């Protein structure tokens, strides 16, 4: 009994001296994960905290393992890692970031000009209008306008020459500003500048950020429009008169003057003119006369042109007439109607063709 007991104890001692193969860790295999390790622990087998060597190593401890201390600082953005990461008994690898990480965006911003020194969103006309309206007498000199703008907006305290030139141009070229001479009781240098009485609706509801319309004096606009219209009318009138003169010269050529050696042609002209000028007297003569279809009377024509074909043909076929011309162009009713019929027949034939 005792021997067997001793042998069992001896066996236990041998088993404790010779560990099993599954519990021996060689330095070649990577370290398995068995407990919540720190995030800074490397898994490289060459830097394993276990001693190399083999069979004489003891079994793994059951408690948490402490990571080795970092060899180099991690950077300036993690100032709190020295205190949080040096404790070996921490079970979690999370470290709260420093105050610089929470507000890093604000720290990364560059320098910004304060709002008071920014350029105001007003035009020069708006600035001048504000300065004049804030004055007790509703008028200011040029230097007083400069001073008011610089006192209210610090942006205009720099580059004074540039924006002051713009102020002077705005005062001179805008009709909404009126130059007022100094009175004898207010001696000094420079005239006053005031707003035109009719420029009250220049801004929308008193908002100087946007101007409603450009103010212009109606008198200047009317004068400019009248001068332009007068010049246009003068040019058009001269062109019209020249055109009328040329048309008159073309449409009214010089009429030939009859010579004393042509009494027959002159009498023929008179007869043709009388015939053409008296169409109403032709109706009673031919009311009861039946004429062929080719010689029917046409509508009365008024050929008064000296070079018309009727007058030219009447000059060739005319015969000496004995008509009395004392009835004011109506023809002689008591004369012989042969010549009158002859001239009328020739005119009807020409019209029928």
Curated annotation (Swiss-Prot):
Stretch list, region Disordered: 52-83, 219-287
Q: Which Pfam families match?
A: Forkhead, Forkhead_N
GO annotation, biological process: cell differentiation; cellular response to starvation; chromatin organization; hematopoietic stem cell homeostasis; intracellular glucose homeostasis; positive regulation of transcription by RNA polymerase II; regulation of DNA-templated transcription; regulation of transcription by RNA polymerase II
Residue ranges with Pro residues bias: 61-73
Give GO cellular component annotations, separated by semicolons.
actin cytoskeleton; cytosol; nucleoplasm; nucleus
DNA-binding region, residues? 118-209
Skewed-composition ranges (Low complexity):
226-254
The record's section on InterPro entries has: FH_FOXA3 (IPR047366), Fork-head_N (IPR013638), Fork_head_dom (IPR001766), FOX_domain-containing (IPR050211), TF_fork_head_CS_1 (IPR018122), TF_fork_head_CS_2 (IPR030456), WH-like_DNA-bd_sf (IPR036388), WH_DNA-bd_sf (IPR036390)
Cite the record's tissue specificity text: Restricted mainly to endoderm-derived tissues (lung, liver, stomach, and small intestine), also present additionally in ovary, testis, heart, and adipose tissue, but missing from lung.
Q: Which residues form a coiled coil?
A: none
Q: Which Gene3D superfamilies match?
A: Winged helix-like DNA-binding domain superfamily/Winged helix DNA-binding domain (1.10.10.10)
The annotated consequence of gene deletion is: Reduced expression levels of several HNF3 target genes (phosphoenolpyruvate carboxykinase, transferrin, tyrosine aminotransferase) by 50 to 70%,. The germinal epithelium of testes is characterized by a loss of germ cells secondary to an increase in germ cell apoptosis that ultimately leads to a Sertoli cell-only syndrome. Significantly lower blood glucose in fasted mice.
Role noted for this protein: Transcription factor that is thought to act as a 'pioneer' factor opening the compacted chromatin for other proteins through interactions with nucleosomal core histones and thereby replacing linker histones at target enhancer and/or promoter sites. Originally described as a transcription activator for a number of liver genes such as AFP, albumin, tyrosine aminotransferase, PEPCK, etc. Interacts with the cis-acting regulatory regions of these genes. Involved in glucose homeostasis; activates GLUT2 transcription. Involved in regulation of neuronal-specific transcription.
| Assembly notes | Interacts with FOXA2.
Protein name in UniProt: Hepatocyte nuclear factor 3-gamma
Species whose genome carries this gene: Mus musculus (Mouse)
The opening ranks of the lineage are:
Eukaryota, Metazoa, Chordata, Craniata, Vertebrata
